[in-house]
Structure formats: C-alpha cells, structure tokens
Amino acid sequence: MTDTYKMVEIVGTSSESYEMAIKNGLARASQTIKAISWFEVIQQRGAVKDGKVSEFQVILKVGFKLAE
C-alpha cells in the first residue's frame, strides 16, 4: 500500500519571534488538520510599526497524510 499526502500553505504569526510564529501556525493548523507529518518554511517576513518590529510572519507549507 502507498500513502498519499496533501500540502497546504498557511501563515503563522507572532509578536515574539519567527520560531513562535512557526509554533503558533502549526498549533492552529493542527486544530483542523489531523496527522500533520511535516512542514517547510517558505518565507519569513515581518511587520513594522513606529520603526519597530511589531509582528513576525512565516509562510509554511504543511503536509499531512490523507485519510484512507
């Protein structure tokens, strides 16, 4: 038997760090996507307010196994 996976893109955010943005994105995605198998960071970026970093953002590709 072979397995089939699906990929979706999500954006995780945090006011603290890129690492927390990844964790926040995966935590939220896991509420609706079961059996997340892997992730890939596609892009890192941030928002600036009043000359200071106000938000860290990461675009993630998330892969999960399709139910049988």
What does each model-found stretch correspond to?
Residues 45-68:
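A cross-kingdom feature marking charged/low-complexity
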Residues 11, 42, 63:
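Residues in well-ordered beta-strands of folded domains
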Residues 36-40, 46-48:
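Amphipathic, hydrophobic secondary-structure cores in small proteins
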Residues 2-38:
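Short, well-ordered alpha-helical segments
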